[in-house]
Amino acid sequence: MALLALLLVVALPRVWTDANLTARQRDPEDSQRTDEGDNRVWCHVCERENTFECQNPRRCKWTEPYCVIAAVKIFPRFFMVAKQCSAGCAAMERPKPEEKRFLLEEPMPFFYLKCCKIRYCNLEGPPINSSVFKEYAGSMGESCGGLWLAILLLLASIAAGLSLS
């Protein structure tokens, strides 16, 4: 799993170009088939790193009635977001329950999924307080400050011990 995540992080930026579209990113309107009705759903179809802000409106195929937005955490401060049309849905959005705070600290690799059937309903992800996310990301670096202090104190004690002998 770690090897797959490493390969994704290293190789993904090299292969991505605007001309290199996956089958899900291609516009179904470009196909030869024109006998489909007008009741197909419109969704955003795109992938981004570390943000839910991507737009690429596409009309889904008639066999794909759902818009999906999914986020997968690869490293503690690195996640991939995919928006696409889908034939099935693992989790349907129900009437909004009480608002809950969105946490990025959970040790789960898959941390957000939303399915819906309304035009462009997969535009926005969960409400993330960017300052809280940055504080969480910065706390990793702050914990290393104690390590440098310990190393400095160790070197000072060694130097003091050598000067006494």
From Swiss-Prot:
Location of this chain's protein in the cell: Secreted; Cytoplasm; Cell membrane; Cytoplasmic vesicle, Secretory vesicle, Acrosome
One GO BP annotation of this record: binding of sperm to zona pellucida
Residue ranges the record assigns to the propeptide: 139-165
Domain UPAR/Ly6: 47-141
Gene Ontology CC annotation, any one: acrosomal vesicle
Tissue-specific expression: Specifically expressed in testis (at protein level).
InterPro entries: Snake_toxin-like_sf, Sperm-ZP_regulatory, Toxin/TOLIP
Record carries keyword Cell membrane: yes
The keyword Hydrolase is annotated on this UniProt entry: no
Signal peptide region: 1-17
Gene3D superfamilies per record: CD59 (2.10.60.10)
Lineage: superkingdom: Eukaryota
Protein name: Lymphocyte antigen 6K
Species whose genome carries this gene: Homo sapiens
Lineage of origin: Eukaryota, Metazoa, Chordata, Craniata, Vertebrata
Gene: LY6K
